[in-house]
């Protein structure tokens, strides 16, 4: 008997390549949709806003604690009773000279609010708002982040 060699083709066909690419695209699409990067970034920015508001509140409370009168000591006057933007522009509450550098090194600003920035005590816009409410029994200071994302309301009162 003769040894006959059977010839076999051992290559990858175009159909196998197309199936492999299709599976890769489907899995990648499902992964990207399930992670929702835009939502993850929005949640991260909201967490950053919460940290900013906490830092600002701590600085304000330290100012009050060190004040002889027990109230907020600021060249801009008392904290407004109606919500006011913390910024250096006219019509805003200029809080930076009262906090920087004694109570906080730099003012934090909203990561996505239009125009929010900090270039120094005389040029800033935090994108955050502050108000003080008083009753016969207590005084509360509220700092809020109106540019919060995902429908979340971010504010801190103490």
Each PLM stretch: what is its role?
Residues 33-36, 54, 58-81, 105-113:
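Alpha-helix exit/C-cap motif
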Residues 1-12:
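N-terminal leader/signal peptides at the extreme start of proteins
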Residues 44, 63-100:
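Short, glycine/small-hydrophobic-rich surface segments
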Residues 42-53:
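Membrane-proximal amphipathic alpha-helices
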Residues 12-22:
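N-terminal signal-anchor/signal peptide hydrophobic helix marking the start
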Residues 105, 117-158:
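Short, surface-exposed interaction loops/tails
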Residues 23-44:
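C-terminal juxtamembrane segment of a hydrophobic transmembrane alpha-helix
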